[in-house]
Structures are given as C-alpha cells and as structure tokens.
C-alpha cells in the first residue's frame, strides 16, 4: 500500500475501542452482582419479618427502615454504575464519529491509469479466485486526500492524542501528571479530546506503576490485583507471587526476620508445590521455585552478615569462607531494585493483557513504522563511504585511505547526527539520524527503497555507485585527465575525486 487508505486507518485505530468495551463489560458484571446482592438481602429481610410475627411493631419498623436505607444506598451505587456505563458508551460513540470523519476526506482514484498491464499467463482456478478477492478489497477501499486541510487537522488531533497518551503513561511525578495537564489545556478549545482517550484508566495505571518503581509501595498494586483477581487467575498470572515476594524482601530489609519467615511459610511456600499450578502454567512454577530456593540462602546471608557487624572478634572460619565466596555476594542482588523491576513488568504485562492493548506506547509504534520506511544504510555514519572524509584527492593504492579520519568514524564521542555533515558543510535533516529519535530507530530494519535509476550501475570501492557510462565519458572539463586515467586502467570518483582501478569496480544489481 503506497497511499494511506480508509481501511488502513480503521484497522490501525481499532485498539481504541477495546478499553471502553472491556470497561463496559466489567461495569455490567458489577451491576449484576450489585443487583443480586441487594435482591438476596431484601428477600432475607422480608422473610425474617414474616417468620417472626410476634416481633414488636417498633422492631419491625426499625428493620423496615434499615432495609429502606440499604435500598437507598443500592440505588446510589446503581445510578453511579449507570452513569459510568453511559460515559463509556459516549466515548465509543465519539470515537466512531471521529473516525468516520476521514470518510469525508477521501478521493476517487482511477486505478486503471496507474496499473501496469501484465502479460496474460495461465492461472489456476484458486489463483484466479484469490486475485479477484484481493481486487475486490482494493476496489472497495478509499484513499485519502492529503491536500485536504480538514484531514491535516484530523491528523493533528491524532498526534496530540498520541502525545497525551505517552505523557500520562510515562509520568514519574507524584504531585501531578503532565499528560493530564496537557489534556485539560487542549480540551478547553476542543472538548472532544476528553472522549477520545481513556485518561482516567491510564492515570490509574500510571499511579500503580509509579508507586511500584518510585515509592516501592505495594498498596495500589495489591488493590488492583484484588479488583481483577478473577481475570488474573484465568490468565495464569504470576502477579500475586511477585507481590508476596516483594513483601517478603521488604520485611527482610526492615530486619523483621521472624515475621518474614512466618509470612513466607503462609504466602510463599504454596508456590513451590506443583499441584497448585495448572498444566499450562509450568513455566511460572519453575521460575518461582528457583526464586524460593534463593530465599533460604538469603536468610543465611542476613544471619552471617548481622553476626559480622555485631561481633568485634573474629567470626568462625567456615563463616569467613562463606562470606568471601562469589555465590554468597549474589544474595545481595535479591535486595536490590531488580525485584521492583520484575513486579512492574509483571503488572504492565497483566494490565495490557486485560484490556488487549500493546505494551509499547502507540506513539512509538507509529514513529517506528515511519522511521523504518526512511532508514537506509547511510544513516548515522557509513565507514565505507568516503564522502564523509575530507574532500581531497587520494590514490586508492595508498593504505591511508582507509585509515584517514578513522578516529572520527569509530570514536563514540564523535557519534551524532551532524558530525559527518559538518565535514561536508551541510545540514542533516534526516529524522532517523536525529538525536531525539536515534535510540528508537537504531534497532529498526532498513527500508527496502533501493531501486536502480542508473543504466549499468557500478559500485566503486568507496561505496559510491554511478552509471558506468558516466565514468567512461567524462565532462569536457576533465576530459583530458579522464582519458589519461582510462589509458592507465583507472577511473576517478566525480564526487570524492578518488582514483580507483577499473578492475576494483563491481557491477551491482539493486532490487
């Protein structure tokens, strides 16, 4: 697909409907449980009054008033759940309407003018059917008018939403969330922003994540686990073990060894029994069992370490050997921040699985797709291409050609998007080479954009490619010089002015 189409945008924005849908399902189940609980309670209260006709009237009135008060509380909870359901449905409607706007920015494209006629070849019936189905899909698709100013505004809104999504999720401050501040600011001029992003859920997600990573507090993640316990149990989640593991190590850090041992026997020991796992959850059993084995060694480490600090005289020879062993010091890692990283990763994995969304930020996904379509092997720096060296004539037989400016090419302190363009007195505007996007783009694949625009292209040893006719037929300015070189079996690079033997040139066949 070379042009943005309507179907592409519908497919790429389908994930924004998952969270409201899951929240509606969850809220509906909450309403069901609320109604069933209230129904049972009212039935029991009425039956209790009927079974005891001799109860004094005053007591009966008190029981009725209590039931009425309970029912009023039920009504308030029910109204709040209904309002929440209406809010979630309004978000779905707003997103459908917002996505439907791009259907007004489409153009009718005559594909028959752009398609190249293919020679008729015998095809099987299956191939013919597949081609017709693919052709039908393409014919039903619509392409967007990129010159439409309303479409540009629509894209700008989408970009703002992606930025808000990233800022809300990646916030590390506890006093305020900069993503929410930006959302409120933009909503003053465009109120629909509040309906197009699930800011409240992402804020809750960020609070739990920050409480784990920054505050090392388990209160919020425990509450989230209890709220979604049924789903996590069905999904074979290991979050409960990670929480209990962190609680155990926190008790060890505080010095409550006896309390930690008691907590471990109740909350961690069952994870060592394979019968407590499902058949599809063997991987978690092996992982948890290995970590449980380390707990015993950690207690020994804490005991010997405490003995070493409290006693002034020499400790036992065996204990001294144990302290100096490499394995002994590995237990120090158990009390590092790695456990909080593991817990946060487990929480993120379960959160994204619950709502069917990606672990990566949506803005990174779009940026990666765009950068992958632009990335070439010339991005950052290319040690083979001598265009990045000083523009001077060097004989190819001189070995210094490959050593000159080697420090600039290999030293990390010279890495940067503009280092080599400074050598050329040019400005590098490539987004792939920009310092802001370097880390995101460095692991992306190269774009398959290499096409031959030359007739009979040849690659020189320095990496530059030219049509062979241009190398053999120089301009009038360098005619005499080139003729002299050709008689010697050599050619000159028109750009870098380097001289090479013709035999060292290679015929290339770009895709």
Swiss-Prot record:
BP terms from Gene Ontology: negative regulation of gluconeogenesis; proteasome-mediated ubiquitin-dependent protein catabolic process
Pfam families: CTLH (PF10607)
Superkingdom field: Eukaryota
InterPro entries: CRA_dom, CTLH/CRA, CTLH_C, Fyv10_fam, ZF_RING_GID
Region span, Disordered: 112-142
Stretches annotated zinc finger (RING-Gid-type): 430-496
GO MF term list: ubiquitin protein ligase activity; zinc ion binding
Compositional bias annotation for Polar residues: 117-126
Alphabetically ordered keywords of this record: Cytoplasm, Metal-binding, Nucleus, Zinc, Zinc-finger
Family classification: Belongs to the FYV10 family.
Described function: Involved in the proteasome-dependent degradation of fructose-1,6-bisphosphatase.
Official protein name in the record: Protein FYV10
Organism for this UniProt entry: Scheffersomyces stipitis (strain ATCC 58785 / CBS 6054 / NBRC 10063 / NRRL Y-11545) (Yeast)
Lineage of origin: Eukaryota, Fungi, Dikarya, Ascomycota, Saccharomycotina
